[in-house]
A protein has these predicted regions:
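Positively charged n-region of N-terminal signal peptides that target proteins for export
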Residues: 1-4
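Bacterial N-terminal signal peptides
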Residues: 8-17
């Protein structure tokens, strides 16, 4: 079972609804954050042009997948080239900046990195978030740019080329011998925007509650049925407080989606570790039908998650088997953010589940006789400590969902 002491290691350290306005109440962006925003929303940085980062990380849905036509089925998004799809659902681009470099903690758990499988380790740039930003542009299943030079040349032609050199210095936008360095600066700029208060405003109903509790000397991470009365009249409704209590106790959600504060800020609801919670295959995943040069296994392909990445790293190969099927614990912030009440979001790394209620039901009843969930995609390394048969009632499941809805930022 994971321990909350993992927080100690954490302290180290797109079609999109383009008309949607983000961060109206946030502080003005700094020059590097503004540069990162322009890069994030630039449709010229794909081949063919037309796909920006926001195509998969839309602000109207918590900076994750904004297109219902994909969410309703595979949950995986089409790249710049029609018919090409990746293999996993877009993770949230917000509230990710505190993730440390991928490493083993004292308990032998992998912590940190970016992407569902942790492959943006942070070893190259010292920043997993920036390393993640370097991936999609050159991925033939995503933005499909042919090389770094093409990306830099596109930025040179952009309306924000001058801003780039104001931020990084004269002649910094170099597509010649320093193209690798320039590409790193592009990624670091995007990471700066993704860390900005516009993307991470901490403005939800829960945040107001958390600050009110802190002002009274109360620690939200300690809430249980016996102490719940102390947290009343601080901004959450009675049902939402009940959901929080269940989230932190019987539901065992907070073991991984931790309530502990990091760097004095409200919690981001992840411990940045990896788990195999037994998610079944998503039969609608379009990656199964991709060309053999992208998916030689076809429908037999299995998502090995972290273990699959560790197999490719010499120093970690011996640990790959123990991490097969594990995927990164995502933030829960803005899991209930959508442009309309009937909007369908996809959940889990492969988009297999389509509602928060289904997610909670899965955690609660995965191993319960008669529940009839499909078999896990990867049966080894299954987490049975915090999921499978929690004994939650239907009302208790609903209360946890109601609590998660308080994590939506006001924009």
């Amino acid at each position: 079972m994971k321990k909350h002491l993992l927080i100690g290691s954490m302290i180290l350290a797109a079609s999109v609804f383009v008309a949607f306005s983000v961060g109206k109440a946030a502080a003005p962006l700094s020059p590097i954050e503004e540069l990162g925003k322009k890069l994030f929303f630039d449709k010229a940085l794909s081949s063919p042009a037309g796909q920006e980062c926001a195509a998969c990380h839309g602000p109207s849905v918590g900076f994750t997948g904004p297109a219902e036509r994909f969410n309703k089925v595979g949950g995986v998004y089409e790249g710049a080239l029609k018919g090409r799809f990746g293999n996993r659902k877009p993770p949230a681009a917000s509230y990710a900046g505190e993730s440390p470099k991928l490493h083993l903690d004292k308990e032998g758990n992998f912590v940190g990195g970016m992407f569902w499988d942790g492959r943006a380790t942070g070893d190259a740039l010292g920043d997993p978030l920036a390393e993640q930003a370097m991936g999609p542009f050159l991925n033939p299943l995503e933005q499909n740019m042919p090389d770094k030079k093409s990306i830099v040349l596109a930025v040179q032609k952009s309306s924000y080329a001058r801003l780039f050199e104001e931020v990084w210095g004269k002649s910094s936008l170099d597509a010649g011998k320093n193209v690798d360095k320039t590409y790193e600066l592009i990624a670091k700029s995007i990471a700066a925007y993704e860390r900005s208060a516009e993307v991470n405003p901490f403005s939800s109903k829960f945040d107001a509650f958390w600050r009110a509790a802190k002002a009274k000397g109360l620690k939200v991470e300690t809430i249980d049925a016996a102490t719940a009365k102390n947290f009343r009249n601080l901004g959450l409704a009675e049902g939402e407080i009940n959901g929080l209590v269940l989230f932190n106790t019987k539901g065992m959600c907070a073991v991984c989606h931790v309530l502990s504060s990091v760097n004095g800020k409200p919690p981001v609801f992840t411990d940045y570790t990896y788990d195999n919670i037994g998610v079944p295959k998503n039969p609608d995943n379009p990656f199964y039908g991709q060309a053999k040069n992208f998916n030689p296994e076809g429908k037999a392909w299995v998502d090995k998650g972290l273990g699959g990445f560790l197999e490719t790293v010499d120093k970690y190969k011996s640990l790959a088997a123990a991490n097969m099927g594990k995927h990164k614990v995502p933030t829960l912030r803005n899991v209930a953010e959508w442009p309309s009440p009937d909007f369908v979001k996809a959940f889990m790394h492969n988009g297999a589940l389509k509602s928060l209620k289904a997610v909670v039901q899965f955690y609660n009843t995965r191993d319960k006789a008669g529940a009839k969930w499909p078999a896990p995609e990867v049966k080894s390394n299954l987490n049975t400590d915090e999921s499978g048969n929690l004994g939650l009632t239907d009302d208790e499941e609903n209360a946890i969902v109601d609590f998660m809805k308080t994590l939506t930022d006001k924009r």
